[in-house]
Swiss-Prot record:
It comes from Glycine max. InterPro entries: CASP/CASPL (IPR006459), CASP_dom (IPR006702). It holds the Pfam family CASP_dom. Glycans are attached at residue 141. It comes from the Eukaryota. The lineage of its organism: Eukaryota, Viridiplantae, Streptophyta, Embryophyta, Tracheophyta. The chain crosses the membrane at residues 22-42, 67-87, 108-128, 146-166. It is a multi-pass membrane protein. NCBIfam families: A_tha_TIGR01569 (TIGR01569). It is found in: Cell membrane. Keywords: Cell membrane, Glycoprotein, Membrane, Transmembrane, Transmembrane helix. Residues 43-66, 129-145 are extracellular. This is CASP-like protein 4D1. Homodimer and heterodimers. Belongs to the Casparian strip membrane proteins (CASP) family.
Amino acid sequence: MPEMVDSNSTPSSSTGSRTVLLLLRVLTFVFLLIALILIAIVKQTDDETGVEIKFNDIYAYRYMISTIIIGFAYNLLQMALSIFTVVSGNRVLSGDGGYLFDFFGDKIISYLLISGSAAGFGVTVELGRGVPSNSFMDKANASASLLLIAFLFTAVASTFTSFALPKKD
């Protein structure tokens, strides 16, 4: 005689993947927030001239903060949609359009995040040549590192959204 399985005892794979996706979005949100705070507070005063240098004085750091803000806004929207989906069991954006929005949105945002991280790393290396390590470079490098980690979480989330795409024959 077949065994009866209680369907309420373990979550379905769909619920499990939605929860994992929400967790990835929360982690991305946290890392983007910390990266944003770090790059926004970074400043250095030149000992010789007394000129204060901030992130907005360097184009690559401006680009980096722009990618953080865009990623932050997108991720905030996706977190809200994910929370609604996990709590209610229904998607806000139903049909193929919602899945395509998730899929392409995650792809585009992940590419933006990695390009922002690369720009931050690149300019930090260039500016740091021949200069002893300082707080400005260390904080900017830490922000680029956190942005890289946020990219990794978004890339993994992108994999989950690609699995959710409706199968077309």
